Amino acid sequence: MGSEERQRLAQRAAWISLAATCVVVAVKLAGAALSGSISVLAEALQSILDVAMSAVVVWAVKVAAKPSDDDHPFGHSKAELLATAFQMLMALMVAGVIIWQAVPKLWAPTPIRPDWGLAAMGYAVVSNMIVAAWLRSTAKKTSATSLSGEAAHLVSDTMASVGILAGLLLYTFTQWTWIDPAAAILFTALGAVSVVKHIYQVV
């Protein structure tokens, strides 16, 4: 596969990832508003971060494709590394904010409507799994590290969504109101750990 073909594939994958994530954001925000679930809201905030990160990936892939010039005699490949570092930093910051907001709700929880949250999380899981698998495949073909970082973040988001689904199901059968904020804290923390691991892999 030639260099131009790899660049074209990487750019297309980045744009599709951005579009798919925008849809997931809309679905999760609707689910959070209708269910009143803080865990679903946390996932919606994570997905908003995904949109910002996907936009950065689109930029990084485009810049990395530029030929070398007088200011960049070795090309622009470092743009992807910078994009990956930015992705990881923003993910950790959002995780901290979510946990900070969810902890007080352990002691002051409120009833929720889990059906809307279940529908939103179910859609998010399926969408993210498909997009992440494609990004990984494209990253291997194109050697685009920013796509690899985006895929890793989507996998982390999917794991959190599965956990939120389980928590909402448990709430449905038990009506334990503390489950929702606990799920938000637990899976946000796990996502942060996944991000840190990916930093070491990239660096």
Model-derived features: positions:
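Alpha-helical transmembrane segments and adjacent TM-loop junctions that form the membrane-embedded core
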Residues: 2-17, 27, 33-35, 39-203
